[in-house]
Regions:
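Acidic-enriched catalytic cores of C-N bond-cleaving enzymes acting on peptides and small amides
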Residues: 189-213
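Short glycine/threonine-rich loop-to-helix capping motif typified by GTGT followed
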Residues: 56-59, 214-218
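FAD-binding subdomain of flavoenzyme oxidoreductases
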Residues: 1-9, 14-198
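Compositionally biased, intrinsically disordered low-complexity regions
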Residues: 6-9, 211, 216
């Protein structure tokens, strides 16, 4: 059970702990072997590492359903610029996209580099919507990201050394649909938006219980 969760959501949830240097595909394979899904799947999954995924807030095809790295992190550990340890723990995890949660909380714990003696603890609280930009989603220009350490900072505020991620379950039935568009690219782009909206809350596809697991556009 992840910290800060009460009520119906307070139940054991599958997670996976990884070192920063683990290749993304190896994590996906380990999750798959356990019947689960690791949501972070950038196109560089065969070469990228977990630490880089956090530092870049990586996403991928499954980000449509479960969000980017930030949405799926339960805990991570860093070395700060002063050489001490920092552990960041997501509280009240919604097991989905972070911007859909009204208030988001992180517990930050600092420890001495040599003795691991606690140096301080604080709770970082912010609106979930602050993690995304209206009409854009992931905002790569927002390096501050509400003050959340490590994520999307590209290594500028410390070194990621380990992380724990929530895992998901794919629906029992899946289908792959291929659509062809002809004519100008500008005519295809609105169709992509319409397809995505169709499966969002309020869309007819979503109302029918169908989820969009991931889109690919060529």
């Amino acid at each position: 059970v992840l910290p800060g969760i009460d009520g119906p959501m307070a139940k054991p949830y599958a997670t996976i702990r990884t070192g920063a240097g683990v290749v993304t595909d190896r994590v996906s394979e380990a999750a798959s072997a356990a019947g689960r899904v690791f949501a972070v799947d950038p196109t560089s999954a065969s070469a990228s590492c977990i630490g880089g995924n956090i530092a870049m807030n990586a996403g991928g095809k499954k980000a449509v359903l479960w969000g980017t790295a930030l949405d799926n992190l339960a805990w991570w550990k860093m070395v700060t610029p002063d050489g001490n340890w920092l552990e960041v723990e997501r509280l009240d995890h919604n097991f989905g996209k972070i911007h859909e949660q009204e208030t988001v909380r992180f517990r930050l714990k600092r420890f001495d580099a040599k003795s691991y003696k606690p140096l301080g603890e604080e709770i970082l609280t912010m609106p979930g919507a602050a993690c995304r930009k209206d009409g854009l989603g992931k905002d790569v220009t927002d390096k501050f990201l509400g003050g959340v350490p490590g994520v999307q900072k590209e290594g500028t505020d410390g070194l990621i050394v380990a992380a724990r991620w929530v895992l998901h379950k794919m629906p029992p039935v899946t289908r792959t649909v291929c659509l062809e568009f002809f004519g100008q690219v500008r005519e295809a782009v609105p169709a992509i938006v319409e397809i995505t909206d169709y499966f969002k809350p309020g869309g007819a596809g979503n109302a029918a219980g169908v989820l969009l697991a991931g889109p690919e556009r060529l």
